[in-house]
UniProtKB/Swiss-Prot annotation:
Pathway: Purine metabolism; 7-cyano-7-deazaguanine biosynthesis. SUPFAM superfamilies: Adenine nucleotide alpha hydrolases-like. Belongs to the QueC family. It comes from Salmonella paratyphi A (strain AKU_12601). GO terms for molecular function: ATP binding; ligase activity, forming carbon-nitrogen bonds; zinc ion binding. Its EC number is 6.3.4.20. Catalyzes the ATP-dependent conversion of 7-carboxy-7-deazaguanine (CDG) to 7-cyano-7-deazaguanine (preQ(0)). ATP binds at residues 8-18. This is 7-cyano-7-deazaguanine synthase. The keyword Metal-binding applies. It catalyses: 7-carboxy-7-deazaguanine + NH4(+) + ATP = 7-cyano-7-deazaguanine + ADP + phosphate + H2O + H(+). Zn(2+) binds at residues 188, 197, 200, 203. It holds the Pfam family QueC.
Amino acid sequence: MKRAVVVFSGGQDSTTCLAQARHQYDEVHCVTFDYGQRHRAEIDVARALALKLGARAHKVLDVTLLNELAVSSLTRDSIPVPDYEPNADGIPNTFVPGRNILFLTLVAIYAYQVKAEAVITGVCETDFSGYPDCRDEFVKALNHAVNLGMAKDIRFETPLMWIDKAETWALADYWGQLDLVREETLTCYNGIKGDGCGHCAACNLRANGLNHYLSNKSAVMAAMKQKTGLR
């Protein structure tokens, strides 16, 4: 039996990954993290979506220690969430240092226990947010280290790594989940489901991608298929 575990936030990207994984694996588990994030509503959204999309199991792990260690606008209400601009060093204040290091490591431990062959994460380098832990180089390096540390061959999959946000919408549409992703996921840094607040960087990226996809469906779908190998 082919098993996979999805790092699942209930946002556009991880929900699209879950929708695809349900077609590619016999059994799919989801892991969501409570790290005291500003947009904690995503945890309840993730629970509902994991159930709706047929995840075999869904775990919510408490990693609130990360909130104490990592200062970010996503972990501190006193720091305003930006619209577009990163800091002078190119890293936006929404970056939570160590988040993906911790998340991927913990999910790999869970995958080891349930005998899953893959850990799936929705990180992407194409519409680069400036987050160093979303880079392909990082994911591959951590995957290698984790496998060495557990003497296990668990594959870190990044289905969205080389597609842009419009193509991510196309991928959701390909799997018949465009409306669900648009209406029921939570990507907004301010914790508003669906189309979100319309102002934060996450909402702007999501909306621009959706508008581009809806205006150029056939071309974007074709580009997505070419990049992902889907037919």
